[in-house]
Amino acid sequence: MLPSLLEVYDEPFADSSALPSLLLSKITKEDVTVALSGDGGDESFLGYNHFDLVKKPNYFLYIPYFVRSIISMLIPKFIFKHRAEKLKRILKIKNDHEFIEGIFTGYNSITLDRSLNWLSNYKNYKHLSRNNYQRTADLNIKLWLENDSNVKVDRASMAFSVEVRSPFLDYRIIEFARTLPISYRYYPGKKKRILRDVLKKYIPEEVFDQPKSGFSVPLGDWIREDLRKEMLEVLSDENLKMVHNLNIPKFKKMLNDHMDGNADYKSYIWRVYVLVKWIKNNNLDEKNYQ
């Protein structure tokens, strides 16, 4: 389905869950033409797993920053391996605002630096609320939902002429959710609380009281096994030179570490793979696409 992915999205779209979205749309079309989607529910009713992270800064931010900086320099890489970089970045967080930004820029990334300013366009948006949970939800809506989730579902469904309706994206639902106390929407161990309370009136709770699971594929294993040859051919030194401003030695090390099973860099490898394929498919070079 990789050729279909590039054709349907017509841009370097590197959310790997687009693949199962295409497959689901294909199967759905066999029975129905119009389907309902739950997109927007996690944003308004605090359902994502990373909302559990929002409370964590309250614990270690009590430790003076200079103390945490010293601790970060003492973390032994040979013990923590690829998690060492993540721990260092977390320890160097200066305040809760920076932590929330880190949820989206990825503190486990060695390819993204916290000095990146791409979030600056949304600083006013995220400060519409003083509550860290709501501010995180606002960023989810503006960055993830708008630029990823909605794009993914819309193009995957329309590729097979399936009409997807998303009732949680009704502006009245979103505005109503913002008026509810955080405790009505989230508390540890039971996310989307109010939706669960409504649903259990109609469906036995044991049916839907399950751990949250993303719409993911075994991408890491695919890269090492089924797609190994494809990956190594596409991510050759010659092709990587077409990607503007890519640190090729660092990326090649990430690729090799992943292939050897020493680290998990599947999301970063997949992004570069999709970008290279998009550049080649459109006969682009550095001068006319950057």
Features from the language model and the residues they span:
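Short amphipathic alpha-helical segments and their helix-coil junctions
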Residues: L2-L5, W118-N131, H244-N262
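Phosphate/pyrophosphate-binding loops and the adjoining catalytic core of nucleotide-dependent enzymes
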Residues: L145
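PAPS-dependent sulfotransferase catalytic core
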Residues: I203-N262
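Structural motif
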Residues: A14, H127-N140, L255-V272
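Secretory-pathway/luminal and periplasmic proteins that interact with or process carbohydrate-rich
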Residues: Y65, D148, V207
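Short acidic (Asp/Glu) and glycine-rich catalytic loops that position anionic groups and cofactors
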Residues: K123-N124, K152-S157, R172-T179, E206-P211, ...
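ATP-dependent adenylate-handling active sites, centered on carboxylate activation for C-N bond formation
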Residues: M1-S120, A156-Y202, D260-A263, Y268, ...
